[in-house]
């Protein structure tokens, strides 16, 4: 089977959909990392970077192996880490992650709101 960017995104969407059905605390999920670039594969290997936002506390990180060459790297955060959203502009890890994110699961537009807040004035020196 030929691994393509589209196939990887489809796999990510299926995992998120399955998780959303199984976990009522899931508020949102977004894709980040190399899969959002032009060339996400290094050779024929890659990982799929996902961020899950939960209503409350949860485990921090998990790794799931889809195939020998493809892994899911899932970071879990409680919703309150993203509030207030404007503070994320100065956060080198989450700010960049959410700025470039591709929302996959966002029924209440939580990620949309956070992205709008982060992207506003993001490139000013104080941020």
Language-model-detected regions and their locations in the chain:
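Helical scaffold of the NTase/Pol beta-like nucleotidyltransferase catalytic core
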Residues: 1-29
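A short linear-motif detector with a strong N-terminal bias
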Residues: 7-11, 28-32, 44, 51-54, ...
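Catalytic metal-binding acidic patch
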Residues: 32-77
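Conserved NTP/Mg2+-binding pocket subregion across the NTase superfamily
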Residues: 4, 62-127
């Amino acid at each position: 089977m030929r691994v393509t960017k589209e196939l990887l995104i489809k796999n990510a969407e299926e995992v998120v959909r399955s998780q959303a059905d199984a976990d009522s605390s899931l508020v949102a999920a977004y894709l980040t990392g190399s899969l959002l670039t032009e060339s996400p594969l290094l050779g024929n290997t890659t990982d799929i970077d996902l961020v899950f936002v939960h209503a409350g506390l949860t485990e921090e990180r998990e790794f799931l192996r889809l195939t020998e060459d493809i892994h899911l790297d899932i970071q879990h955060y409680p919703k309150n880490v993203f509030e207030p959203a404007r503070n994320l502009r100065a956060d080198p890890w989450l700010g960049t992650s959410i700025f470039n994110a591709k929302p996959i699961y966002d029924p209440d537009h939580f990620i949309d709101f956070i992205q709008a807040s982060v992207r506003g004035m993001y490139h000013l020196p104080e941020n």
